[in-house]
Amino acid sequence: MIGRALSCTGIFCAIILFSAVSAAFPVQDIQKSAENERDIMQDERVTMLLNELKEKNSDGVLDKKEVKELLELSKELFGDENVHVNGLCKVTGIGGGLVIPPYLPITPVLIAVGAILLDTEGTNGHWCHAVHLAIMIPFVGGPIFIPPYYVIIAGFAGAVIGIALS
């Protein structure tokens, strides 16, 4: 009971802190990459990756081979140092952007776009990175989108691919 109260308090404090920071430093377009001011969704590499994901997910299920091919394509498009991977992991994240689909507790593919601080702990160890694109296959948990641009992710995933655009 105390652990739940502390984790809820921590999430609540993180939301308040994120709200205060975003109010102090207004975000004109949260989907723009900080370094090069390009719209993330207009990047042809992101479009190619999402189209490949859509093609592979046409039957609603991604098997291990398809996930591995998606990971290889991600590393080819964005560079090995910009792609972070974990498997069978706990996922938490907070940031600004968009999560698709929001509010569904179980989904075969969850995509988060924007500026997201993503923390995972699983078979590949622990990593915490700021990413622009996160793909979680499959996802069980709470993907929450709070307008205008807040994203909160808490749950478990079979595979997580986090991509930082450079």
Feature annotation, model-predicted:
Residues 1-41:
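Secretory targeting signatures
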Residues 7, 19-22, 33, 58, ...:
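Generic serine detector
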Residues 15, 47-51, 163:
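Intrinsic-disorder/low-complexity peptide segments enriched for small residues
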Residues 16, 66, 101-102:
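Residues at secondary-structure transition points
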Residues 25-96:
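N-terminal propeptides/leader regions of secreted preproproteins
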Residues 76-166:
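Mature secreted bioactive peptide module from preproproteins
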